[in-house]
Amino acid sequence: MAKVIGIDLGTTNSCVSVMDGKDAKVIENAEGARTTPSMVAFTEDGERLVGQPAKRQAVTNPENTLFAIKRLIGRTFEDPTTQKDKGMVPYKIVKADNGDAWVEAHDKSYSPSQISAMILQKMKETAESYLGEKVEKAVITVPAYFNDAQRQATKDAGKIAGLDVLRIINEPTAAALAYGLDKKEGKTIAVYDLGGGTFDISVLEIGDGVFEVKSTNGDTFLGGEDFDMRLVEYLASEFKKEQGIDLKNDKLALQRLKEAAEKAKIELSSSQQTEINLPFITADASGPKHLTMKLSRAKFESLVDDLIQKTIAPCKAALKDAGVSAAEIDEVVLVGGMTRMPKVQETVKQLFGKEPHKGVNPDEVVAMGAAIQAGVLQGDVKDVLLLDVTPLSLGIETLGGVFTRLIERNTTIPTKKSQVFSTADDNQSAVTIRVSQGEREMAADNKLLGQFDLVGIPPAPRGVPQIEVTFDIDANGIVQVSAKDKGTGKEHQIRIQASGGLSDAEIEKMVKDAEANAEADKKRREGVEAKNQAESLVHSSEKSLQEHGDKVSETDRKAIEDAIAALKSAVEASEPDAEDIKAKTNTLMEVSMKLGQAIYEAQQTESAHADAAADAKRSGDDVVDADYEEVKDEDDRKRSA
């Protein structure tokens, strides 16, 4: 049976894992790393780079290197968080025809689902390379506090990447699965997940294979990216004070600042001080300018203290919703790269009154949990029951714009709930059902997920028709809503798709684009491999010809030289043809065989001569020494007498 993989699609980094026997194994990517930067870049010549190769060239290509795309997924362009993000990134965020936030690179627009799909494709290829077989099914994680539009957009990304997404699972829940799979005794745990772009807190009861989420809370726009930007702003303002130049207007300088900020942040988790050194960051009439600054851990902590404090209110809300006090939490599990920061750990310790558990790898535990859930769905992992919750209340807009809840937040999913409503006016023949998600009392203040009309209601006084509205949330946390006129039996049902969101036709087009790109990427890779092999063969052939050319006839030598020249010409062409390079590589290999044979024969002859000389030496060395006695002749005896 084909394996189902688990993918942690992160804001900053992504990770893929698979069940290996009874354990979840994190798979290394082509670059040998266990996590992959969630970055996609488009180069001048149309090449698409994903992961570490994209990150490496970000400084020289900031406008076409897309990162932290997860923060835009499922969001509209007018969303305040989108507008905030616009000022934080060097690439363009644009308004799509449907009002969604899309991104632009080299004058081409992409949906966040499309860019996320490119990262998912990379994770898919990583798994396929390790497993040696095709991968078509996956479990993908999302922040627990993602709304329906964001979950749907993530599922769309999986589809575009060629994956059948069996389950969307919340990141803290996945982490709890990986942490508690072998725990038999009952425990109440809190998972504090501060990642690259989002913050989640979940309270769970775990024990003997049952994982029940009691509550969840969070902030989908709070994470490591904000910590980095806070430091970037500080560095830019200090530089402006010293040099009078605003680096924020220079996208290339801004990208260098961002990389330096991320590096400094990581170093300050283990050191009390770090030095930021950026030579030639900019220039003016007086010449080049350099940025050099010492930064202490205490200064960095003061810059980001309010961001850390923003995690406290969601933690308190989650504890309240779960009906437990901080003292009743047996263990606090830290997840996400930002939890390596000592100040974050100290804040968690103060809040919960205990040392947080650091026994899991915060970068890998979510992907491992996704792989365990994949194992559960596949039947490889037995006796595990996972009960998750919906993070936000769901309801409809009723008379006066009031938000009427049908499903309260932290309700265990899957779930189904119905409620009967009526008309607001006499002889009303149609009603518009406006579905929202959130915690505010007025519908306009919550996230509108979608709307639809129920038509054909028979004329009747207001309040008489009975319209039953049913909400159905599946295990992925994705909502389906239906409305039924109980008098006529007429029903209208929709899977909620955000007022923006991708249509099925758009998704299908993106799937085809992704497949075409995968084919183009494969051809490009084959071309590079063919070129590398050709250049290596040219080098070795020229060297062999130089050293041993006198061992073959003039005709053979000329044939090799011609083949080398032809292959060089193919490699150096303005648009190299992989098939042409392969054919000319084979030709050179064939004509070089005579040279190789001559070298081999010459070596054999030399070896034979060497063996003969050695044998001769050995036979000379075998002469036996004889004992002898000196005998004097007669004359000698006479002379001595």
Swiss-Prot record:
Entry keyword annotation includes Cytoplasm: no
Keywords in alphabetical order: ATP-binding, Chaperone, Nucleotide-binding, Phosphoprotein, Stress response
The keyword Phosphoprotein appears for this protein: yes
Cleavable signal peptide: none
Biased composition (Basic and acidic residues): 514-529, 540-554, 608-621
Region feature Disordered, mapped onto this chain: 514-554, 604-641
Positions where Phosphothreonine occurs in the chain: T198
HAMAP family, A to Z: DnaK
Functional note: Acts as a chaperone.
Official protein name in the record: Chaperone protein DnaK
Lineage, highest ranks first: Bacteria, Pseudomonadati, Pseudomonadota, Alphaproteobacteria, Hyphomicrobiales
